[in-house]
Regions:
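Contiguous, well-folded functional domains in the mature portion of proteins
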Residues: 1-135
Length: 135
């Protein structure tokens, strides 16, 4: 499901695929292989209500047959299913401009400690910075 709200009547881009391997995606493996650079990836660019331009990137992983995205260009809304991973799970990376988002402190601290954090769909990860909400 799409984790952020896109601007009304602003279409997301088509899906872009980047060929790559299917290494396991976990903190230990990332010490040996740069999975976010080497694994198969698919991404979409969009304009969001509170964060400005953003990218959602799905990262393929070991035991993931492929990435399936339903929509090409078009209007999306928060909570809509954008696609899924066939067989198994993987990782989704959200990219924002640094001045637009404030990540929750508990996630930053766990990251500094090298800990993986399991998250649930819909769980808050951060919020738009105040100046971002006003622009």
């Amino acid at each position: 499901a799409l984790p952020i709200s896109v601007k009304t009547n602003e279409p997301k881009s088509r899906n872009y695929f980047i060929k790559g391997a299917y290494h396991t995606v976990n903190p230990t493996a990332n010490n040996y292989v740069s999975v976010y650079k080497e694994n198969a990836r698919e991404f979409t660019m969009m304009k969001t209500e509170h964060f400005g331009d953003a990218v959602q990137m799905e990262v393929g992983a070991l035991m993931v047959g492929r990435i399936v995205n339903h929509h090409e260009e078009g209007i999306m809304h928060r909570g809509m299913e954008k696609g899924y991973f066939e067989f198994g799970g993987s990782t989704i990376v959200l990219l924002f401009r640094g001045d637009k988002v404030e990540i929750d402190e508990c996630l930053l601290e766990r990251t500094k400690d090298g800990c993986e954090t399991k998250l649930k769909q819909g769980q808050r990860l951060g919020m738009a910075k105040k100046q971002s909400l006003q622009s």
